[in-house]
Amino acid sequence: MLSPKKVKYRKKQRGRLSGEAQKGNKISFGEYGLVSLETSFITARQIEAARIAMTRKIKRGGRVWIRIFPDIPYTKKPAETRMGKGKGGVDHWNAPVKLGTVMFEMAGVIEELAQEAMSLASSKLPVKTMFVVRRDLR
């Protein structure tokens, strides 16, 4: 699963996401993309599940790029622990995804297969998504 090798601070405050994506909202590498229609945090496990679903569908035919990276730590205290005694340990890593962010890209396969693969990946994610083609975004 994806996670940062080294971070400046181990723990971070939750924060909030708002607005549309200013960066990462165009297809840069492939021909097809999966764009977020909602704002949310996506876990490293969800990204990995989507990646596996796509690569299994396209077999060895094409190439997949993951355009988001989980670099926000999510902490959690153990079950049945009293309040206090400091912030909990890092439970998992999240990737911030704003409306309009291109999350995955794909190339080297026909459009119908790419759409099916992206649909499978979309079902693994907690946000509504849209399949886009590079020629549509120009």
UniProtKB/Swiss-Prot annotation:
Entry's family note: Belongs to the universal ribosomal protein uL16 family.
Annotated NCBIfam families: rplP_bact (TIGR01164)
Keyword tags: Ribonucleoprotein, Ribosomal protein, RNA-binding, rRNA-binding, tRNA-binding
Gene symbol of the encoding locus: rplP
Biased composition (Basic residues): 1-15
Keyword hit for Transferase: no
Summary of subunit composition and partner proteins: Part of the 50S ribosomal subunit.
One GO term describing the cellular component: cytosolic large ribosomal subunit
Protein name: Large ribosomal subunit protein uL16
Region (Disordered): 1-21
Biological processes annotated in GO: translation
InterPro entries reported in the protein's UniProt record: Ribosomal_uL16, Ribosomal_uL16_bact-type, Ribosomal_uL16_CS, Ribosomal_uL16_dom, Ribosomal_uL16_sf
